[in-house]
């Protein structure tokens, strides 16, 4: 499988996404250390981490085929476990709400 060009390209794409997420995470950490409000960047990083984790483990599972879905395979375990990243500490929808609020695009409540 490793000689397949599609797999090479897919792994390169995933590595690029991981590095972009790492940069976002470092930027959020730098803001926090500097005493600035890092809520927006931290929420973006958490949202992206959950989604990217699912994308990476899904791709690995696809490469492994049926064997990747077997209980004793570490890919199967990672596939199941990574789902908690998007749930624990605030679901994706909560992170999106926080980001929208900080962007100033969340609709305000109307008072009639």
List PLM regions with ranges:
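Alpha-helical interface subdomain recognition
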Residues: 1-112
């Amino acid at each position: 499988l490793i000689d397949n060009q599609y797999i090479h390209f897919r792994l390169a794409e995933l590595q690029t996404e991981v590095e972009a997420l790492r940069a976002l995470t470092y930027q959020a950490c730098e803001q926090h250390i500097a005493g600035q409000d890092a809520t927006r960047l931290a929420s973006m990083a958490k949202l992206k981490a959950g989604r990217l984790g699912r994308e990476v483990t899904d791709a690995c599972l696809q490469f492994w085929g049926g064997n990747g879905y077997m209980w004793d395979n570490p890919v199967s375990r990672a596939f199941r476990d990574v789902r908690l990243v998007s749930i624990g500490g605030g679901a994706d929808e909560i992170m999106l709400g926080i980001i929208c609020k900080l962007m100033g695009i969340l609709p305000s409540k109307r008072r009639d």
